[in-house]
C-alpha cells in the first residue's frame, strides 16, 4: 500500500468510500456520528484544496482509504473534559478516516503513515465507534478525555499519541 495526497479527480472514488463507511457505521451501532451526509462533498473538496486530504492505494493503485491530516489547531480540542491531553505541544490532527469495504489493515497503515510524519497526533471519535477506538488503542493512542464538537454539540472521545 502507498499513501499520497488526494486530488479532485479522486473525488468520486473517495465519496464511494465514505458511502460505505456511513453504512458500516450504521450497521455497527454508530448511526449518528456521521449520519447520512457527513462529510459533505464541500468538506472533502476543501481538504483536498488545502492539501490535507490523503488517499491510500492498494498494490493495484485502487483507492482503498481516505483521511484528512494536518498540523494546526483544532478548536474543538481547546477544552477537554474528564481527562487531559498528554502534552501541550504543537500537534497534528487526523480527521475523516474511512476505508473501502473489502480491505483489511488500511486504517492501521494510514495511522502509522501519519505518525511517521508527525510524532504528536490528536484524534477523536464517537463513543459508539468501537472499531475506531480499537484501532486507535492498537496503534498506541491513549484515551485522554472527552471533547465537545461545536458544529453539532456532540461529544467525542479524544485520543493522543506522542513519542
Question: Regions from the language model: what does each represent?
Answer:
Residues 117-129:
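Conserved GNAT acetyl-CoA-binding A-motif
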Residues 124, 142-156:
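Conserved catalytic-core motifs of GNAT/GCN5-like acyltransferases
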Residues 45-55, 72-75:
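A short helix-loop-beta-strand connector motif used in the catalytic cores of GNAT acetyltransferases and
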Residues 68-98, 102:
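Conserved acyl-donor/pantetheine-binding loop and adjacent beta-alpha core of acyl/acetyltransferases
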Residues 51-67:
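Conserved beta-hairpin
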Residues 2-16:
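A short beta-loop-alpha structural element at the N-terminal edge
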Residues 23-43:
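Conserved GNAT-fold acetyl-CoA-binding loop/helix
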Residues 99, 103-116, 134-138:
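Conserved acetyl-CoA-binding loop-helix of GNAT-fold acetyltransferases
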Amino acid at each position: 500500500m502507498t499513501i499520497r495526497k488526494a486530488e479532485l479527480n479522486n473525488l468520486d472514488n473517495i465519496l464511494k468510500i465514505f458511502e460505505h463507511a456511513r453504512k458500516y457505521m450504521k450497521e455497527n451501532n454508530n448511526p449518528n456520528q456521521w449520519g447520512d451526509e457527513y462529510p459533505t462533498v464541500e468538506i472533502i473538496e476543501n481538504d483536498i484544496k488545502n492539501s490535507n486530504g490523503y488517499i491510500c492505494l492498494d498494490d493495484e493503485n485502487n483507492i482503498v482509504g481516505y483521511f484528512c491530516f494536518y498540523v494546526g489547531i483544532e478548536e474543538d480540542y481547546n477544552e477537554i473534559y474528564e481527562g487531559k491531553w498528554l502534552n501541550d505541544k504543537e500537534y497534528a490532527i487526523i480527521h475523516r478516516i474511512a476505508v473501502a469495504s473489502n480491505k483489511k489493515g488500511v486504517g492501521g497503515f494510514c495511522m502509522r503513515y501519519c505518525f511517521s510524519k508527525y510524532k504528536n497526533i490528536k484524534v477523536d471519535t464517537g463513543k459508539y465507534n468501537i472499531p475506531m477506538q480499537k484501532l486507535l488503542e492498537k496503534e498506541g493512542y491513549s484515551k485522554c478525555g472527552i471533547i465537545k464538537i461545536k458544529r453539532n454539540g456532540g461529544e467525542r472521545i479524544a485520543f493522543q499519541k506522542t513519542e
